[in-house]
Amino acid sequence: MTRRNVVAASAACLFAILLSAAACAAAIDPAASSIGFTLKTRWGRTLVGDFPKYDGEIALLPDGRHQVRLQLSARDVEIEGNQTFTRLTRGEGFFDAGRFPRVDYVSDPYPAELTRAGGRLGGLLTIRGVQRREVFVIRPAVCERPGVECDVVASGSVDRNHYGVDRWGFALSSRVVFTLRVRTVAGEGA
């Protein structure tokens, strides 16, 4: 085999690998999924937040494990029924969406069985440019193909102070509980 043929064959193999990797990611369906959070005030009121705009996928890695990759729009975050809290949440004292327009999460690689059986899923959460390891708890699935036939449901509690979201301590709890209900577009499970 000539050097030219080896280079051409290598390029063809690399192209095939890249194509198969792209085909192995299941996009998160924004019409059938929801990503939000709750936050308690010091007076006992629960504020319910929603990320109506986000991008995400569940990638199938070469070793057969999966990985969640999410980008949530902090610019579009909403607090249900309260425009004042919506404005404050997007502002400098909370997400500071003008400077940090996204909240990112990349999970650790995990076996597909985790979404069926439930369990803990670690990963890197980035808020306001601060990246920290956090753990979310996946609930056991109520169907055979989670993400396709039923939601994958996960939740996790983070301390907002760890991300520089430390204003309004007199009025807001430091704990923020994120909740995700996820379905995929591609028809591939999570």
Range-by-range predicted roles:
Residues 3-7:
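N-terminal export leaders
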Residues 8-9, 186:
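Intrinsically disordered, low-complexity segments enriched in polar/charged small residues
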Residues 10-21:
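Bacterial N-terminal signal peptides
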Residues 24-190:
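Low-complexity, acidic/polar, glycine-enriched regions of mature
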